[in-house]
């Protein structure tokens, strides 16, 4: 820990930060245990880095909810994606490694909310992370779950995730499959070509 403050001081902020009831450990130990599982599995460096950094922004996003009677960490995945990018750039990791890890940190919460995991949502996720990365994201989820210190990932739930990913990969969707395109949107909105048209297309795609 004494050396850590000179390398990744952001990790130290998790020491003593109590989490919600789903976790036995504070943020610091949870990150280390998540990393340890990735190492035990001998998974590649980008998964290990994602594991140790995945909850890097929980300390600054922690709030206490009187309604839930527990802590919440809303947005820690989005903030963490940016923070992990800053850390890896500072440590001079390659652009490819930086992009991949920050992406995994950004999307690591997807498989934690089973009620929102639909086939359409999985397809959109694959579009966001790339089909070559989706299985690594599931591996990161496994590490995260083990790192909580609670019961291991329930087999039926993991099988459900895997089945949905396999189905989505066999029947992928893309912007090209929408029944509209940039030209039609420009005709209707009278907008000129530019980022706004892309935003509209992606917003429509998210509703598929």
Predicted region positions:
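Divalent metal-dependent catalytic cores for phosphoryl transfer on phosphate-bearing substrates
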Residues: 26-29, 33, 37-151
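Core structural elements
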Residues: 3-6, 109-110, 186-191
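A glycine-rich phosphate-binding loop feature that marks nucleotide/adenosyl-phosphate handling sites
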Residues: 1, 11-16, 52-55, 100-108, ...
């Amino acid at each position: 820990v004494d050396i850590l403050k000179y390398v990744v001081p952001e990790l130290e902020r998790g020491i003593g930060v109590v989490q919600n009831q789903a976790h036995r450990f504070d943020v610091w130990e949870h990150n280390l245990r998540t990393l340890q599982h990735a190492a035990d599995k001998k998974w590649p460096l980008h998964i290990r880095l994602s594991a140790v950094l995945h909850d890097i922004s929980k300390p600054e996003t922690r709030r206490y909810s009187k309604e839930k009677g527990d802590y919440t960490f809303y947005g820690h995945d989005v903030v963490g994606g940016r923070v992990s990018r800053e850390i890896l750039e500072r440590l001079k990791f390659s652009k490819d490694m930086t992009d991949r890890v920050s992406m995994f940190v950004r999307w690591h919460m997807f498989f934690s909310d089973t009620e929102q995991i639909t086939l359409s949502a999985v397809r959109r996720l694959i579009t966001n992370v790339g089909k070559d990365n989706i299985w690594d994201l599931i591996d990161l989820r496994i590490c995260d779950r083990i790192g909580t210190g609670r019961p291991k990932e329930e087999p039926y739930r993991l099988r459900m995730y895997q089945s949905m990913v396999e189905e989505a990969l066999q029947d992928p969707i893309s912007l090209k499959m929408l029944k509209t395109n940039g030209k039609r949107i420009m005709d209707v909105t009278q907008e000129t070509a530019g980022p706004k048209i892309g935003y509209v297309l992606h917003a429509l795609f998210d509703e598929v």
